[in-house]
């Protein structure tokens, strides 16, 4: 792996690994090696959820559990993590098998998001909980400063449905138009048909639900509600 690219990634992450093999494992998709990043992803997912929940709890002392849950969901969802990955230029650093490389896996949101979680797990194992908490909060500083409780934190499908109902319009319809990948690593493509939008809106995700949410979010943007 290109050391220049790896060093640039570590600068963008704000962390230099002592155990280099942990970094390489975090960047390794299961299509590339049996020593892949899924266990690190499992660990990182839990750590990220805790750090964000703790930050929201202390930032919003008067906000109820429901609003905090919705804010956390916004901050840890796949497309937010994929945005972080693109800020880190993470796609250039991924270790992918030939099939994933050919299909553009280095651009796929689900792979980028999973790798960010794996990096969180790897940094924790390479350091301690205080270090990874500090790093996550630095990554999320702008997003934490900008987020606020309220209807905007409801998931996209709920917001789209409420908007259409409020305007006495038909509910959206969601149709699976493509499923690719093996059972353990699938990508779903959904078309969402919405009254007021001429063409179906497309969303992709690692599950049908995530793809529907992504399509609903795109529909909201076209309706200028995002």
UniProtKB/Swiss-Prot annotation:
RNase III domain mapped to chain residues: 6-128
Residues noted as binding Mg(2+) in the record, renumbered to the chain: 41, 114, 117
Domain of life the protein comes from: Bacteria
EC number(s) per entry: 3.1.26.3
A Pfam family that the UniProt record links to this protein: Ribonucleas_3_3
Gene Ontology annotations of biological process type: mRNA processing; regulation of gene expression; rRNA processing; tRNA processing
PROSITE patterns: DS_RBD (PS50137), RNASE_3_1 (PS00517), RNASE_3_2 (PS50142)
Keyword rRNA processing: yes
GO molecular function: double-stranded RNA binding; metal ion binding; ribonuclease III activity; rRNA binding
Catalyzed reaction equations: Endonucleolytic cleavage to 5'-phosphomonoester
The entry's keywords: Cytoplasm, Endonuclease, Hydrolase, Magnesium, Metal-binding, mRNA processing, Nuclease, RNA-binding, rRNA processing, rRNA-binding, tRNA processing
Coarse class of the protein's main subcellular location: cytoplasm
Domain DRBM: 155-225
Cofactor: Mg(2+)
Active site: 45, 117
Quaternary organization: Homodimer.
Role, per record: Digests double-stranded RNA. Involved in the processing of primary rRNA transcript to yield the immediate precursors to the large and small rRNAs (23S and 16S). Processes some mRNAs, and tRNAs when they are encoded in the rRNA operon. Processes pre-crRNA and tracrRNA of type II CRISPR loci if present in the organism.
Entry's family note: Belongs to the ribonuclease III family.
Family matches, as PANTHER family: RIBONUCLEASE 3 (PTHR11207:SF0), RIBONUCLEASE III (PTHR11207)
Protein name: Ribonuclease 3
Source organism (scientific name): Photorhabdus laumondii subsp. laumondii (strain DSM 15139 / CIP 105565 / TT01) (Photorhabdus luminescens subsp. laumondii)
Source taxonomy: Bacteria, Pseudomonadati, Pseudomonadota, Gammaproteobacteria, Enterobacterales
